[in-house]
Amino acid sequence: MKPDRGPRGKQSQAELMMMTVADVIKQLVEAHEQGKDVNLNKLKTKTSAKYGLSAQPRLVDIIAAVPPQYRKILVPKLKAKPIRTASGIAVVAVMCKPHRCPHINFTGNICVYCPGGPDSDFEYSTQSYTGYEPTSMRAIRARYDPYLQTRHRVEQLKQLGHSVDKVEFIVMGGTFMALSEDYRDFFIRNLHDALSGHTSNSVSEAVRYSERSNTKCVGITIETRPDYCLKRHLSDMLSYGCTRLEIGVQSVYEDVARDTNRGHTVKAVCESFHMAKDAGFKVVSHMMPDLPNVGLERDTEQFIEFFENPAFRPDGMKLYPTLVIRGTGLYELWKTGRYRSYSPSTLVDLVARILALVPPWTRVYRVQRDIPMPLVSSGVEHGNLRELALARMKDLGTECRDVRTREVGIQEIHHKVRPYQVELIRRDYVANGGWETFLSYEDPEQDILIGLLRLRKCSEQSFRPELKGGVSIVRELHVYGSVVPISSRDPSKFQHQGFGMLLMEEAERIAREEHGSCKIAVISGVGTRNYYRKLGYELEGPYMVKKLD
């Protein structure tokens, strides 16, 4: 077969593509040396036209072709979707196999708004997912194999120019803790093995090897329900190396939980928050405005209650406005006119009000689901709801002061601002029967957050033996800013600048002098245990612990 002759005489399309990529890199290097900013898309279009190419070179090809001596300079500029690792870690979402919702046994049906699952129109999808979200599609391609899902996603992020030294897993796909113990162990074992390259026979062995892996697992997040967040579940999750829970709350109203067929009470939510925080977990809740029989006023009221009532007060929130999807009970209500979604402008208004209520110690992880618009019959009409809500807040003169909005990495990407004068700020509050202290390094003038630490004086009811009898626990330590490989120090990035150590010293002082604790514990991701060993901590059960003299 003859090679495809391009318009430049004898070269094939592949050769022209190589010349285009080389030219793009050459121009990028020149622009860097002259200190100029370059619009990459314009540059690709112009260079492709110059060589008569029908298609532009892919970003992955350009990143792969950057010479070694320029990689440090150019790859950060070429990085696709820099937000992916702006918070300091690469997040890898994996899905467990499709299984039925556990509360079908005693409520007779799934939640009224819930799509997906083995009995739905989307039969190969997990419960509450349609199978068309990016994560679901990756999981289906890998046939829900945890090892393959992890390897493929890590490789993909690498090719896009991200540093994958630190990985955080999110285990999605319905109630993971409702699956059999054998399957759960197999799943978690494979996640750790995919990073360490070892083949383990048990979870404890996988965790041991994962501690020493080059790609560190800095945390695992598991999605669960309040009734699958009891003491035995929490202990299992600690043994997996899990550090954060995503608990489906959806509404703080008892009547709404009953009408939507949740299968648990609001009291169960408060109890699971209490137990989870006393075991050291970070608690992220899923909330759904616009559910049936609520209305705008009650929706606003429930978020005031949610952030101000000490029985709730989560560390993070995912805000999922209700969507009407074919095949759900809600779809039938909508079709017969018994349910109506808010209009787009009302929804933007409501989300703007909710974001204004968020306290500075809570992080809003997501606003709206990742479900493709063609599958949505009614509900959110915009793909960029958070941006629209933030713009509406600007008009109203309010601001969103949650953790994510103020992070140094995100501020740099969106507003090109860097912190100038950094100081330690302390906020104390009471939540779920314990005394919480939120320590952070911030630039108060520009309202930028560099690092944070969550410290808790455990309540008397803590069920873990390691945390009984006057123990303080560090539930989270995180320095923001783009991922910096663990072995290197980059003076322009904020990770590995010693902020973490300063925050830990202050936490130890508060635990000793104010809490009157005899020891301090840290719930640490498997891959970060060595960091705490350097600070004088040692492993006791699943926690890193240090005696306070």
Curated annotation (Swiss-Prot):
Annotated PROSITE patterns: GNAT, RADICAL_SAM
Matching Gene3D superfamilies: 3.40.630.30
Free-text cofactor note: Binds 1 [4Fe-4S] cluster. The cluster is coordinated with 3 cysteines and an exchangeable S-adenosyl-L-methionine.
Key word Acyltransferase present: yes
Positions of transmembrane segments: none
Cofactor (UniProt): [4Fe-4S] cluster
Keywords: 4Fe-4S, Acyltransferase, Cytoplasm, Iron, Iron-sulfur, Metal-binding, Nucleus, RNA-binding, S-adenosyl-L-methionine, Transferase, tRNA processing, tRNA-binding
The enzyme's E.C. designation: 2.3.1.311
Residues that hold [4Fe-4S] cluster according to the record: 101, 111, 114
Domain of life, per lineage: Eukaryota
Function description: Catalytic tRNA acetyltransferase subunit of the elongator complex which is required for multiple tRNA modifications, including mcm5U (5-methoxycarbonylmethyl uridine), mcm5s2U (5-methoxycarbonylmethyl-2-thiouridine), and ncm5U (5-carbamoylmethyl uridine). In the elongator complex, acts as a tRNA uridine(34) acetyltransferase by mediating formation of carboxymethyluridine in the wobble base at position 34 in tRNAs. Stabilizes transcriptional repressor snai1 by inhibiting its ubiquitination which promotes neural crest cell migration.
Principal location listed in the UniProt entry: cytoplasm
Positions of the N-acetyltransferase domain: 398-549
GO cellular component: cytoplasm; nucleus
Radical SAM core domain mapped to chain residues: 84-374
Recorded GO MF terms: 4 iron, 4 sulfur cluster binding; metal ion binding; phosphorylase kinase regulator activity; tRNA binding; tRNA uridine(34) acetyltransferase activity
Keyword DNA damage appears in the UniProt entry: no
Gene name per UniProt: elp3
Descriptive protein name: Elongator complex protein 3
A Pfam family it matches: Radical_SAM
Source organism per UniProt: Xenopus tropicalis
SMART domains the record matches: Elp3
